[in-house]
């Protein structure tokens, strides 16, 4: 079952169980997926759905920080619930050691030696770490390894 189909099934399940908060969060996810499909005029595959979910996670984290600073516990709780729900659809995150090994092997495989080679390294890594690691952290780790 594709990721998009699984989300649709979970929407139906939440409707039947009268889980309002979960249903609202799932509808936000489906709306983001549909928006991307309409914008691009394509049916999204699992990899593209993961990219949409990654973007939503990043947005939720930023919102959480802002709500914490503003002391808005009510909004913070809702945002955290949405973040947890989105995380349930993402694959298991990569550990720091596994990520470092993957970066090292990709750099070796491509023969990258300087910061100029960062683009091809990131392009090779992106499909492997999409949804499993924060791309900003991956970028910083690649930059650090290429600089040394």
Task: Pin down the residues of each PLM region.
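Charged, compositionally biased, marginally structured helical/coil segments
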Residues: 1-148
């Amino acid at each position: 079952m594709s990721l998009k189909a699984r989300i649709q099934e979970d929407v139906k399940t939440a409707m039947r169980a009268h889980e309002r908060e979960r249903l609202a969060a799932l509808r936000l996810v489906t709306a983001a997926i549909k928006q991307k499909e309409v914008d691009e005029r394509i049916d999204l595959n699992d990899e593209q759905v993961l990219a949409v979910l990654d973007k939503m996670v990043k947005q939720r984290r930023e919102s959480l920080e802002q709500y914490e600073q503003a002391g808005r516990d009510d909004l913070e709780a809702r945002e955290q619930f949405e973040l947890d729900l989105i995380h349930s659809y993402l694959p298991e995150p990569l550990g720091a050691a596994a990520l470092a090994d993957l970066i090292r092997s990709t750099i070796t495989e491509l023969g990258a030696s300087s910061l100029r080679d960062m683009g091809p390294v990131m392009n090779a890594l992106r499909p492997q770490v999409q949804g499993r690691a924060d791309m900003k952290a991956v970028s910083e780790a690649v930059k650090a390894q290429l600089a040394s």
